[in-house]
Every structure is written in structure tokens, then in C-alpha cells.
């Protein structure tokens, strides 16, 4: 791993709890500073922040969540979220696609894995909760890929559609680039068929 990658990963770890507290604060405060913990993007996908253990029942019973796509690294979910076994016990399958916080970009392969996972649950009429720490960047990139696949939208159209529902998403230029690659692959595949 390059020195810059080590620094980025270290910075993400140092800032994890302060930025998580900020996310919790924004979820609890009332008024214009309030941010909902999660949003329903369509009939299948919910985009949100860490699914804390106390949210499990609501996600499963009220939102019909049967799949969870975790874009976090292991240390981010260790104490506050369900383990894969705990999700399974609740009737939920977890797919972890670890991506470094703040600077990380989901890989093209992981975007494809995540989209296929969501499509599996879409076919079953069930829902998938896609999350990272705050539900703003890593997970929003994954949801954009899903929308690109489902609607044959451009990356910009997918991001705009998400932002209309969850206005505080933040897709960085490097994440937009991987979405453009994803779109190019999806478009090329569709042209062959």
C-alpha cells in the first residue's frame, strides 16, 4: 500500500468517531440542520447512515429490509452495528464491500457486486439498506450505480435523482469517475445484447 493510502486510511480512522458524532447530532437536532438517518430511494433501495443495532427491528419489519450493503471497513461497524451473524439471525443477508472513509472509491468490481445484490432482492420484492457511516458518499456512489443499471441513466442523472431525495449526499470527482466507467460498461453490455 502506498504511503498516501496509509495516511488516508489512518486519517479516516482518527476522524471516525468525531464525524460519527456529527452525523448523530444532525439526526437528532430539529430545524433546518436536521438530517434524516436514511431515505427510501425507490421501492427496493434505502440509502442511509450506519444501521445501528437499535434500528434492526424497524428496518426489517417496517421497511422490509432483507439485504444490507455495508460500504464500511470492519472497524467502523464493530461496536455499533450488527455483525453478519446478527443480521442473518434477523433474516437479513449482509454484503460488505469495504471502502476507506472520506477518500475511498468503491471499485468497479464492487459496484457490480452491490448492484447484483440489490437486483436479487428487487426480484424477490424485498428491500436493501445501502450504507456507509453517514450515507453521503460511499453508499451514495453504490446507489447511483444501482440507478444507472436499473434506469439506464447517466451518472449525473442518477446523482441528481438521489440528491432530490437525500440532499446532503456528496459524490467526489473520483467517485464520479468510477460511476462513468460503470456506465460505460453497462452501456457497452446493453449494446451487445
Curated annotation (Swiss-Prot):
Transit peptide (first-last residue): 1-31
Tyrosine-protein phosphatase domain residues: 37-188
Tissue expression profile of the protein: Predominantly expressed in testis. Expressed at lower level in heart, brain, spleen, lung, liver, skeletal muscle, kidney, bone marrow, eye, lymph node, smooth muscle, prostate, thymus, stomach and uterus.
InterPro entries: Dual-sp_phosphatase_cat-dom (IPR000340), Prot-tyrosine_phosphatase-like (IPR029021), PTPMT1 (IPR042165), PTPMT1-like (IPR044596), Tyr_Pase_AS (IPR016130), Tyr_Pase_dom (IPR000387), TYR_PHOSPHATASE_DUAL_dom (IPR020422)
GO MF, any single term: protein tyrosine phosphatase activity
UniProtKB keywords: Hydrolase, Lipid biosynthesis, Lipid metabolism, Membrane, Mitochondrion, Mitochondrion inner membrane, Phospholipid biosynthesis, Phospholipid metabolism, Protein phosphatase, Transit peptide
Active site: 132 (phosphocysteine intermediate)
Involved pathway(s): Phospholipid metabolism; phosphatidylglycerol biosynthesis; phosphatidylglycerol from CDP-diacylglycerol: step 2/2
GO BP annotations listed: cardiolipin biosynthetic process; phosphatidylinositol metabolic process; regulation of intrinsic apoptotic signaling pathway
Membrane topology: Peripheral membrane protein
Membrane-traversing stretches: none
Chemical reaction(s) catalysed: a 1,2-diacyl-sn-glycero-3-phospho-(1'-sn-glycero-3'-phosphate) + H2O = a 1,2-diacyl-sn-glycero-3-phospho-(1'-sn-glycerol) + phosphate; O-phospho-L-tyrosyl-[protein] + H2O = L-tyrosyl-[protein] + phosphate; O-phospho-L-seryl-[protein] + H2O = L-seryl-[protein] + phosphate; O-phospho-L-threonyl-[protein] + H2O = L-threonyl-[protein] + phosphate
Disulfide bond residue pairs: none
One GO cellular component, as annotated: mitochondrial inner membrane
Entry's localization field: Mitochondrion inner membrane
Consequence of gene loss (knockout): Mice die prior to E8.5.
Residues modified as N6-succinyllysine: 85
SMART domains listed in its UniProt record: DSPc (SM00195)
The EC number(s) this enzyme carries: 3.1.3.27, 3.1.3.16, 3.1.3.48
Subunit field text: Interacts with STYXL1; the interaction inhibits PTPMT1 catalytic activity.
Family per record: Belongs to the protein-tyrosine phosphatase family. Non-receptor class dual specificity subfamily.
Function, in words: Lipid phosphatase which dephosphorylates phosphatidylglycerophosphate (PGP) to phosphatidylglycerol (PG). PGP is an essential intermediate in the biosynthetic pathway of cardiolipin, a mitochondrial-specific phospholipid regulating the membrane integrity and activities of the organelle. Has also been shown to display phosphatase activity toward phosphoprotein substrates, specifically mediates dephosphorylation of mitochondrial proteins, thereby playing an essential role in ATP production.
Record-given protein name: Phosphatidylglycerophosphatase and protein-tyrosine phosphatase 1
Native source species: Mus musculus
Amino acid at each position: 500500500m502506498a504511503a498516501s493510502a496509509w495516511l488516508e486510511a489512518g486519517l479516516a480512522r482518527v476522524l471516525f468517531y468525531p464525524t460519527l458524532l456529527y452525523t448523530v447530532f444532525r439526526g437528532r437536532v430539529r430545524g433546518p440542520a436536521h438530517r434524516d438517518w436514511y431515505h427510501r430511494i425507490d421501492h427496493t433501495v434505502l440509502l442511509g447512515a450506519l444501521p445501528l443495532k437499535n434500528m434492526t427491528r424497524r428496518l426489517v419489519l417496517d421497511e422490509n429490509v432483507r439485504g444490507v450493503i455495508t460500504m464500511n471497513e470492519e472497524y467502523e461497524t464493530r461496536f455499533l452495528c450488527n455483525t453478519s451473524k446478527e443480521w442473518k439471525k434477523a433474516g437479513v443477508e449482509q454484503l460488505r464491500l469495504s471502502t476507506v472513509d472520506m477518500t475511498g472509491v468503491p471499485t468497479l468490481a464492487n459496484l457490480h457486486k452491490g448492484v447484483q445484490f440489490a437486483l436479487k432482492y428487487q426480484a424477490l420484492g424485498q428491500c436493501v439498506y445501502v450504507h456507509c457511516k453517514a450515507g453521503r458518499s460511499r453508499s451514495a456512489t453504490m446507489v447511483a450505480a444501482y440507478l444507472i443499471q436499473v434506469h439506464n441513466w447517466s451518472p449525473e442523472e442518477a446523482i441528481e435523482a438521489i440528491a432530490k431525495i437525500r440532499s446532503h449526499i456528496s459524490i467526489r470527482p473520483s467517485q464520479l469517475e468510477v460511476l462513468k466507467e460503470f456506465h460505460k460498461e453497462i452501456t457497452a453490455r446493453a449494446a451487445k445484447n
